[in-house]
Amino acid sequence: MTKIIAVTACPSGVAHTYMAAEALESAAKAKGWEVKVETQGSIGLENELTAEDVASADMVILTKDIGIKFEERFAGKTIVRVNISDAVKRADAIMSKIEAHLAQTA
C-alpha cells in the first residue's frame, strides 16, 4: 500500500494549515493510500511524524510557504513541495501527480 506523509504550515499558522492537512488526507484516502499529516500551526506541532512514519513513507509532501521545522528528517526521501493554497484547493491533482510519479518509478 502506498504511504504518503505530509507536513503543512502557513504564515499565520491557523486555518490554512489545518484545511490543507484535511484536504491532503481526504485526497490520499480516496486513492486508497495510507496517509499521516503533521501540522505545524500556531499551537505548535500536532500529529508529529515519527522516525518510523518517515522511514516507511513512499512520498513526502511539504508546504513551501514558510519553512518546515525539522525538515532534515526527510533527507533521502522523495519530496513534493506545494503551496498551501494548492494543498487546500488542488489536493486531488497533487495526488494524481504523485500517483503518476510512483507508477514511473515502480
From Swiss-Prot:
Q: Where are the Phosphocysteine modifications?
A: C10
Q: Main site of residence?
A: cytoplasm
Places the protein is found: Cytoplasm
Top EC group: transferase
Domain of life of the native organism:
Bacteria
Protein name per Swiss-Prot or TrEMBL = PTS system fructose-like EIIB component 2
Q: Which chemical reaction does it catalyze?
A: D-fructose(out) + N(pros)-phospho-L-histidyl-[protein] = D-fructose 1-phosphate(in) + L-histidyl-[protein]
Per its UniProt record, what Pfam families does this chain match? PTS_IIB
GO MF assignments = kinase activity; protein-N(PI)-phosphohistidine-fructose phosphotransferase system transporter activity; protein-phosphocysteine-D-fructose-phosphotransferase system transporter activity
Q: Domain notes, please?
A: The PTS EIIB type-2 domain is phosphorylated by phospho-EIIA on a cysteinyl residue. Then, it transfers the phosphoryl group to the sugar substrate concomitantly with the sugar uptake processed by the PTS EIIC type-2 domain.
Identify the coding gene: frwB
Q: Which organism is it from?
A: Escherichia coli (strain K12)
Q: Name one GO cellular component term.
A: cytoplasm
Organism taxonomic ancestry: Bacteria, Pseudomonadati, Pseudomonadota, Gammaproteobacteria, Enterobacterales
